[in-house]
């Protein structure tokens, strides 16, 4: 029996793409900061001259799937993290945006076999979003951990030709 697991020690050489929604940037900037901090602390060189981490900004969560797909098709990235914040309003717009964003991002994962981390907050209020992107609990950190684990896991499986 073979057991495959992601290994954080083997993740510092991963090429990581991050796609960030500019809408609700008060939140998404905090998520990105937590994400970058986690990557640094796990040995990923996030300096711009190293080209280990690339960041693309899009207008909103609805645009995340397209740019994620374009990044994935380059085959440069071992894993891609999507970051966004969709906060419920008084209209059905919230439901449409999050439905299309989540389906689109999932489709990219299936079509490319590149792990895509779904880091899009869906909250009822700005306060809930701030709590999830804050100092005590920044989900951006967790999304980066997922990326390191999934990137190293997929690479291990490729080496074993599973």
From Swiss-Prot:
Q: Pathway it acts in? A: Cofactor biosynthesis; riboflavin biosynthesis; riboflavin from 2-hydroxy-3-oxobutyl phosphate and 5-amino-6-(D-ribitylamino)uracil: step 1/2
Q: Name one GO biological process term.
A: riboflavin biosynthetic process
Chemical reaction(s) catalysed: (2S)-2-hydroxy-3-oxobutyl phosphate + 5-amino-6-(D-ribitylamino)uracil = 6,7-dimethyl-8-(1-D-ribityl)lumazine + phosphate + 2 H2O + H(+)
Oxidoreductase is among the record's keywords: no
Q: Where does 5-amino-6-(D-ribitylamino)uracil bind?
A: 23, 61-63, 85-87, 118
State its Enzyme Commission number(s): 2.5.1.78
Q: Which GO terms describe its cellular component?
A: cytosol; riboflavin synthase complex
Alphabetically list the UniProt keywords: Riboflavin biosynthesis, Transferase
Which residues are the active-site ones? 93
* Annotated function: Catalyzes the formation of 6,7-dimethyl-8-ribityllumazine by condensation of 5-amino-6-(D-ribitylamino)uracil with 3,4-dihydroxy-2-butanone 4-phosphate. This is the penultimate step in the biosynthesis of riboflavin.
Q: Which family does it belong to?
A: Belongs to the DMRL synthase family.
Q: What is this protein called?
A: 6,7-dimethyl-8-ribityllumazine synthase
Gene of this entry: ribH
